[in-house]
């Protein structure tokens, strides 16, 4: 239970006690979605001259966000603004995406893992909580397996990991890649939209929301970046057995309208971790923070508070 006075305590009060009329709707949150970079941001140097664009906000236990291939650093701001009160939130662009270095050869999963550790080293951070979503949950898993001493806890939001394997996720990702390669970015967005967003949110946003988010989507990445990312997503370990080796406290968060992982699947997945638990967000889709940014941040803050209390 979160202790009175902790950041998680106040976030939970907000999430549980606000009247429906006081809550910011998903549409209002997405109206605040940012895609612009900070021109004065400093880049961190990592392996072989790789430079990573990053932003750091707040103070306290460190939360490192891990982008899926469809997100960039600016998009995290609206989904971590409350979390940055009482925590240090560090967001960065993956190598090969956004404002980070674009090497001639796209990074492997192992190189992405080393980039995470290199960024922590550059910022003199000993340990961090990894906040991952969709395909970046694979990166969080691999960092925790290869560098357990650097990981204090893991949040898997709408994970691309399954309790029995990743075959279903791979089929979906392969279909996304095929759409992108044959029909382009706008077609990929139309393909993704009903699979990523929950039904409630799609109804709330309507056609104006669909079109507005499409403009943001097209501004976030290039076709080349997404092709590279989706091709990488089709590689790497798929067995759920490796999860038993992850000792870090782990929180699985899904929406009950996530088409890629059911609530019962989330429970089974959490049970694969020695120190795992799960939360189901009503009405949310594959990326639950899109549907309820405040509620999601409250769950993450509560999880961190509980881990910090036990430490």
List where the protein language model places each region.
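Conserved HGGG/HGGXW glycine-rich cap/lid loop of the alpha/beta-hydrolase fold
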Residues: 46-102
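Catalytic active-site module of serine/aspartate enzymes centered on a nucleophile-bearing elbow/loop
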Residues: 276-311
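Flexible "cap/lid" loop of the alpha/beta hydrolase fold
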Residues: 141, 145-146, 152-182
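Acidic catalytic loop of the alpha/beta-hydrolase fold
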Residues: 257-261
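Short beta-strand/loop motif that positions the catalytic acidic residue
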Residues: 246, 252-254
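Alpha/beta-hydrolase fold catalytic core
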Residues: 1-64, 85-87, 125, 301-311
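Active-site loop/oxyanion-hole signature of alpha/beta-hydrolase fold enzymes
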Residues: 81, 90-132, 298
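Conserved alpha/beta-hydrolase catalytic His-Asp/Glu region
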Residues: 166-167, 185-242
């Amino acid at each position: 239970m979160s202790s009175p006075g902790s950041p998680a305590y106040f976030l939970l009060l907000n999430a549980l006690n606000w009247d429906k009329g006081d809550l910011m709707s998903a549409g209002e949150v997405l109206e605040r979605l940012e895609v612009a970079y900070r021109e004065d941001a400093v880049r961190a140097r990592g392996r072989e001259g790789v430079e990573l664009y990053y932003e750091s906000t707040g103070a306290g236990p460190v939360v490192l966000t891990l982008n899926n291939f469809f997100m960039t650093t600016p998009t995290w701001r609206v989904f971590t603004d409350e979390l940055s009160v009482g925590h240090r939130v560090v967001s960065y662009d993956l190598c090969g995406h956004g404002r980070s270095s674009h090497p001639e050869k796209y990074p492997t999963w192992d190189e992405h893992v080393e980039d995470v550790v290199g960024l922590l080293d550059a910022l003199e951070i000993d340990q961090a909580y990894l906040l991952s979503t969709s395909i970046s949950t694979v990166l969080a898993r691999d960092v925790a397996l290869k560098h357990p001493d650097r990981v204090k806890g893991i949040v898997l939001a709408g994970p691309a990991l399954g309790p029995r394997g990743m075959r279903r996720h791979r089929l979906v990702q392969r279909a996304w890649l095929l759409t992108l390669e044959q029909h382009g970015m706008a077609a990929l967005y139309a393909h993704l939209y009903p699979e990523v967003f929950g039904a409630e949110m799609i109804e709330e946003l309507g056609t104006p929301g669909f079109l507005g988010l499409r403009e943001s989507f097209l501004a976030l990445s290039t076709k080349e970046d997404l092709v590279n990312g989706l091709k990488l997503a089709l590689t790497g370990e798929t067995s759920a057995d490796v999860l038993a080796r992850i000792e870090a406290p782990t929180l699985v968060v899904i929406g009950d309208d996530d088409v890629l992982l059911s609530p019962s699947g989330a429970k089974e997945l959490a049970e694969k971790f020695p120190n795992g638990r799960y939360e189901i967000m009503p009405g949310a889709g594959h990326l639950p923070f899109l549907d309820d940014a405040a509620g999601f941040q409250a769950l993450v803050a509560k999880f961190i508070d509980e881990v910090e209390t036990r430490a």
